[in-house]
Amino acid sequence: LLLQFTNMRKQFRYLSFLFVIILYSCSNTRKLAHSDNGKIDVNFVLINDVYEIAPLEGGKTGGMARVATVKKELLQKNPNTYMVMAGDFLSPSVYNSLKFEGSRIRGRQMVEAMNDAGVDLAIFGNHEFDINENELLSRINESRFKWISSNTFHQTANGVVPFAKTLAGTAEPFAKTYIMTVQDADGTTARIGFMGLTLPFNNAGYVNYTDLFATAQTCYNQLKDSCDAVVAITHQLMEDDSLLALKIPGLALILGGHEHDMRYGKVGNVIITKAHANARSAYIITLELNKIKHQVKVSTRLQMINDQIAADSLTDAGVKKWMSIGEKNYAALGFDARKVVMANGDPLDGRESMIRTQTTNFTKLIIQAMKQASPESDLVLINSGSIRVDDILQMPVTQYDIIRSLPFGGSIMEVDMKGSLLLRIMAASLKNMGIGGFLQYSPELVNVNGTGNWSLHGNPIDPDKVYKIALTDFLMTGGEANMDFLKKDNPEIIKIYPTHTDVTDARSDIRLAIIKYIAGLKP
C-alpha cells in the first residue's frame, strides 16, 4: 500500500510538471502569435468630385450610402481603413439653388451624407469656393471629418489665416500637414503623413493660395523624417499630379481628384489614383508598410459603385430625406424629377473642359431646345456657365439630370438688338473661351475662318440691322464676364419681349424647354 501511494505521488508530480510545461508552451506560443512583426496595412477608400448623394442612371450607379457600405466592409477586415474625399463636393449641385429651413442648401446635403458615410479626411477642390464665404464656413462647421489644407488659406479683412472649424466657440485651424498614427492587433504602429493640395483655379475673394509645388516640397520635408510614409491628397490635373510625383519621388502615394473619369498612373515609384466622379467608383488603396525593412508597397483596386452593393441604412436615410426635400422643390416648379426623358442614345457631354471651349452633343441639344421654344428668333445664345453638371450624362437621362445640369434654370428672354451689339457680344464670347462666359449659339451663326467676322445664314452680320435674339435671362443682367454692357437699358437693344412665367410655356424655364424638346424627338 505504501509503495502504491509513493507511485501515485510520483505520477502526480510528473503530471503537474507536464501541465506547467504545456501551460508555459501555450502562453509562449500566444505571445509569439501576437508579437510585433513590424508589418501593418492601411486601407484608403478614395472618392472625388462627388456632387450627387443619391444613385444616378436610374439607380444603377453611385450613391454615398453604397460607398459607406464599402468602407464598413473593409473596416470589418482591417480597422485601419479610412475614407478620403479629394475635393469638389459642395458645388456644383442642383441643391445649391434650393432652399430648406429658410436658407439656400449650398452643400449642406453633401456634408451630412459625408458625415454619415464615414468620410475621415477631405481637402478643398476648386468648386468649394463657388459658394460664398459664410456658406462655406457653415459647411465646414457642420463637418465631422478632418480637413487638410496645405496651400489654400482664408483671406480675411485682417490678413491671410488658415481656414478653421469652429466648435463650441473655439476655432480649430486647418493643418497644413497631418500625421496619422495607426496600430494593428500585434502592436505594430506606424505614422503616415498627409498634405492637401488644391489647384489655384477659383479666385474667390476670400481665398488665398500659395505656390502648390513649393508648398508640397516644404510639407514633404517637414514630414519625411518623422513618418513611415507620406501621402499627398490633391485636387489638380493629372499632368500636375505626375509633375508632383516627379518633383517629390519620395511620396508613397497621390490620392487625387479633379478629372471626372477614373485615372491611374505611376511615376517612378509614386502611384496616382483618381476615381470616377459622383461616386460611380471608389479607389481602394492599401499601403503595406514593413517597418523592419523600411519598405512601402502600394496595391490598388477600382471598386465600381453600383446596385450590387447594399445601401448603408444610416446614410441612406439621410439621402432619402434630402431627395424628398429636393423633389418637393422641383414639383413646385413643374418638374417630375424621376421621370425618364431620354432612355437611350449617346451620353451627353457637359464637361466644363469641353463646353467652355467648343460645342458638344449636349450643348447642341440645348440650343435646339431653345430654338424650338422661340421659333421666331433669328439666333439663340446661352452662356456655357449656365451648364454646371461638369460631367457626362449617361443613359437613361431623367428630368432630374436636366435640372442638375442647369441648376440655376431661368427663363428664355427674347429681345431685338442691333447687329453692332451682337458683334460686340460675340467678340466677348471669344475672349471668354475657357470660362463660363464662352457662349453656345445657333449653328447658323459662323465665325468666318476664325477671324472674328461673323455671318448668319451665310450673310455677314449687319451692324445696323435688327436681329431677334433668344437668350438666357442671366445674360441680360450684365453679370457675365466681359459682358457688363449687356443690360436691358443698352440703347442698342430695340425691344424686350414680355417674360413668360406660365410653366406651360417652355420659355418660362430653360430646363422645361429642354425636357419638352427631348420629348418630341423620335426614339
Whereabouts are the PLM-identified features?
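Catalytic centers of hydrolytic enzymes
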Residues: 32-41, 52-55, 68-72, 76, ...
